[in-house]
Every structure is written in structure tokens, then in C-alpha cells.
Amino acid sequence: MPLTEQCQISDLTAFEMVKGRKIVDFTTSAIESFEAPKINPLNSTAGEQWEFDGVSEDGMQSFVFGFYRDPNYAILGTGNFRLSIEFAFANRTRFYEVYYASRSVVEHCSVGTRGEWVDDADGYSFSFQIKADMSEAMVFLNSPSAKGTVAIKSRARPVTADGHVWPAHNASTEGVPFYHWSEPIPAGDVEVDVMIQDHPLVFQGMGGHERFWSAFSWFTCLTHLSAVRTMLGPYVLTYFSFTSNINPGETRQSVVLFKDGLPVFRSTRAEASDVDDYALVSKTYGGAVTGTLKDKVTGYQLELVSPGRMQHYTFFVEHANLGFEYILGEGVGGSGFSGHSRGGHVGLSQYQGIALTEALTFPKNSPLFRSNYVA
């Protein structure tokens, strides 16, 4: 992606941030590009992430990449630029590495956005390129143990936290208070061509891309997170649910369904209604694949209902392989699964496809997770 014209460039080193209690720019707009840096400059509490993920056509292989600018992860390494690389293979083994880059550069231009996390001393660089309309993304891996490219081409439209298609003046990027989220690529076609420790991994399937940014640490803002991304037949379905830690008990969800690239359903309502569109989402149990955490979820069921338009969609997701798992104590943590999906409009054609799910629960008491809320 040639970046030939004037660009906004954010070039930071690993420990570069403002000192003390100083207000920094924190963008919450649902109009501007989701890819531009949202926090400028960094301070000691706020952080942001560019996330990319994908699942193979058979539902057995997956990847998740996280590009972070977040001082809250400094407790786990050195500096503010955490970068995580995760792959799950069909034989149920996994590859996982974390890097702490010395430098992060994000160039935001009219043709698109390019980010690079690099450490010349340790000999690695990881980068991404995203078109201005957020229809395509490329990720480039270059380290001693992971090399190659991942290409994602969207089959939907970028959406805000409340499910509106970008750009939208009446939309919100707030998942829960102080925690913001958007989905530049709800789902699309992915092509993976990488070498992991000299072993080739090549597959096609479904990919997606998320953006997260928060004024405080995830633990400060959240107690729970759940997500489903699936692509089947003409449909792309995305679901996210967040439970606030700052406003105890407050849960917000967002469900959007695309058909042939266009939105056909959106709702933030989690209770049944005779008038308003709503989505009932529940975990399912008793399947073959689960993780080691206390919650032995093996899939999801999603009921999307529009009383006014006489529409009712039902989708099922069943886990096929564990993509990643973080044990955070007290039997809880974060886990992600690749899997299979089926569903469609009730009484009409039904389809089969692939899915990625994620669930996160923070422990109630841990010395590693303390609130950094500042009034």
C-alpha cells in the first residue's frame, strides 16, 4: 500500500508517555476511521489494540494476533508495545509467542493505515496494512519463529459498538463506560500463508478484525466479555457482550447480521419484545470440545427476532478446537475456540459455515489485576 501523500504519523518508543495526571486525547468518534490511533499521547492508564483473527475452512485451525499500545501490560513484560501471536493446529497443538517491541509506528493516510511493531535489536518486525474503507487488511509476520502473510477481505461493512454501519453520526463506540470497541471487518475471506518454526501453515477460511481502546485497564472496565463471529452461506453474523466492572451488573450486547454484504438485522436488546428487534444469546454445553476453565461452554445459540418485520433467524455454533486459553486464577480467564456453525432464517434455506468464539472472565481477587481508575 503506497503511502505517498501527507500522513498522520504516530511514532513511539516503548516507554514514551506523558507523566503524572495529564489529560490526553481519547477519541470516541464513530465518524472517523477506526484504524487511526485513539490515544495521543499514551499515559499510564489508557491503552488500545488492533486485533486480527481467523479460522480455517474445516474449523480446526485458527490464529489470533494482537498489536497493543498499552502500559497496563507492562506487568507481563517490558514496555508498552505488547504483541501476541497465536496459532492453533488441527492436531490440537498450539503455538504462542509474546513480544515487547521497542518501537511502534502507525501511519494513517487517505489511502489507508499501516502499523509496525519492530525491535531491531531482537531481529523481528510485525506489521499490518488496512485500506481506508476497511474492506481489506494484510498482516505481515517476520520473526525467527514466525514468517509470512495473512490477507483478509471483508464480506460485510465496518460496524460500531451499537451495531451501526460506519460512518454514522448517531452511533456509539462505547461497549461499556470507558471501554470502546469497533469492528472494521466483522468477517470475511482469509488467506493464510506462514511458516511457524519452519513448518508451513497454509489455509483459507474466515477472518476478522477488531479495534479496542479504553481509558483504563480491561480489568478496571470489564468483568466479562463474550463474542461470536461466524460466516455461513450468504450470512455474516457478529455478536459481542460486555459486562461493566465500573457499573456493576450492567451488561450491553450488540448483534449484527449481514446478508450478501448488507446489514439485515441489528439490535442491542437482550430481552424478548413484541415490538423491538432483539437477540437472545445463550451458551450451550455437552459438546465435545471445551477448555480447562470452570465454564465448560461448548458452543452458542443465537436467536435474532424482528417482530415488526416478521423475521426470525436461528444460528448454532459448536466448538471444534481450542484456539487459545489464558488462566487468570480462581478457575476463570480467557479462551477462544474455532468451530462450526449452522443456521439461517426460520423456515427458509439453512447453511453451514465456520465460527470463532471468545469468552473472558476476570478473577475477583488477584494481585495482578487491580483497578487503575482515576476520577
Swiss-Prot record:
<protein>
    <recommendedName>
        <fullName>Diels-Alderase ccsF</fullName>
        <ecNumber>5.5.1.-</ecNumber>
    </recommendedName>
</protein>
<dbReference type="Pfam" id="PF22903">
    <property type="entry name" value="DA_C"/>
</dbReference>
<keyword id="KW-0413">Isomerase</keyword>
<dbReference type="Pfam" id="PF24137">
    <property type="entry name" value="DA_N"/>
</dbReference>
<comment type="function">
    <text>Diels-Alderase; part of the gene cluster that mediates the biosynthesis of a family of the mycotoxins cytochalasins E and K. The hybrid PKS-NRPS synthetase ccsA and the enoyl reductase ccsC are responsible for fusion of phenylalanine with an octaketide backbone and subsequent release of the stable tetramic acid precursor. The polyketide synthase module (PKS) of the PKS-NRPS ccsA is responsible for the synthesis of the octaketide backbone. The downstream nonribosomal peptide synthetase (NRPS) amidates the carboxyl end of the octaketide with a phenylalanine.</text>
</comment>
<dbReference type="GO" id="GO:0016853">
    <property type="term" value="F:isomerase activity"/>
</dbReference>
<comment type="similarity">
    <text>Belongs to the Diels-Alderase family.</text>
</comment>
<dbReference type="InterPro" id="IPR054499">
    <property type="entry name" value="DA_C"/>
</dbReference>
<comment type="pathway">
    <text>Mycotoxin biosynthesis.</text>
</comment>
